Amino acid sequence: MTKGLSWGWTAIKYLAVFLVIYTAINWWRQPVMPANPDLQLTDYQGQTVDIAAMSHDSPVLVYFWGSWCAVCKITSPTVQSLAQSSPYPVVTIAIQSGDNQELRQYLKAKSFNFTTINDEEGDIFKAWQGQVTPSFVILKDGEMTQGLTGVQPEWSLRLRLWLSSVF
């Protein structure tokens, strides 16, 4: 009995250390909102997307990804599901994923129909000091409330958007 209890405490300690390290790495790698960000952008179809205005109605999830990113192949379907079924707007920024025609073909092949800004040269991502893809930012009232990186389950993104709408 003592052996089982000891194992349980060891597992809890390792979990706590893992969570602290995971949180620290995520905090360090998260994008940083520029001082004067350009939040009125044009999507790959030529439509104006005013993220700041959208964020005054409800929190907006901004998803930085690339067609070349292996992890994004896991997270993009989650973002697609969220964009289709969530009351919160989703805007994606495709980083260095080709010209508008190549991006259009990629999105069509994957059946993604979320709003997408084509960051052909990666300038938007650089302005946000992005370090890794995928990266997520939640904006509310034109301000960044949360930044995340890596694989994020849909329930976590939904919860974070809801919390941003409440607080």
Where are these regions (language model features)?
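Short, small/polar residue-rich loop motifs at catalytic or cofactor-binding pockets
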Residues: 35, 58, 131-132
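Short acidic-hydrophobic, aromatic-tinged amphipathic segments that line or gate anion-handling sites
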Residues: 42, 115-119
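Hydrophobic beta-strand positions
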Residues: 41-44, 138
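Short active-site neighborhood of thiol/selenol oxidoreductases, capturing the structured segment around
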Residues: 50-73
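Hydrophobic beta-strand anchors of alpha/beta hydrolase catalytic cores
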Residues: 61-62, 90, 136
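Thiol/disulfide oxidoreductase modules built on the thioredoxin-like
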Residues: 108-112, 120-167
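N-terminal targeting signals for export/organelle localization
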Residues: 1-42, 167
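Structural microenvironment flanking redox-active thiols in thiol-disulfide oxidoreductases
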Residues: 73-110, 120-126
